[in-house]
Amino acid sequence: MIHYEKSIQKSYKKGEIPKRILRLFHNAFLSLELTKDMNLFDIKKIKGNYKREYYRLRKGKYRAIFYILKNDFYVIHIGKREEVYDKWQ
């Protein structure tokens, strides 16, 4: 199952995340959920000392930050590359 933070929904409603980009990420997460193969996409583990293992998924200039818990995907931030890493921490 894919879970999105409320902040992502707010950003989408404000127009900060284009519908096309949100659809690209959602389709990628659906494919990940079905295949469980992270090598199909441009996904990298985020380095650092965090409580969880965070990953980033890249689609053009946009990034999605997420973690996996019991085969569920929790997307915590979607944004442009320049700002995404500063805002989610």
Enumerate the language-model features and the residues they cover:
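A short, surface-exposed loop/turn module that caps and links secondary-structure elements
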Residues: 30-56
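A residue-level signal for beta-strand positions that form part of recognition/binding surfaces
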Residues: 1, 54, 72
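Arg/Lys-rich, positively charged N-terminal/basic patches that mediate binding to nucleic acids
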Residues: 1-29
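Enriched for short, Lys/Arg-rich terminal
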Residues: 6-7, 13, 59-63, 67-89
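General structural signal for secondary-structure boundaries
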Residues: 21-22, 36-37, 67, 80
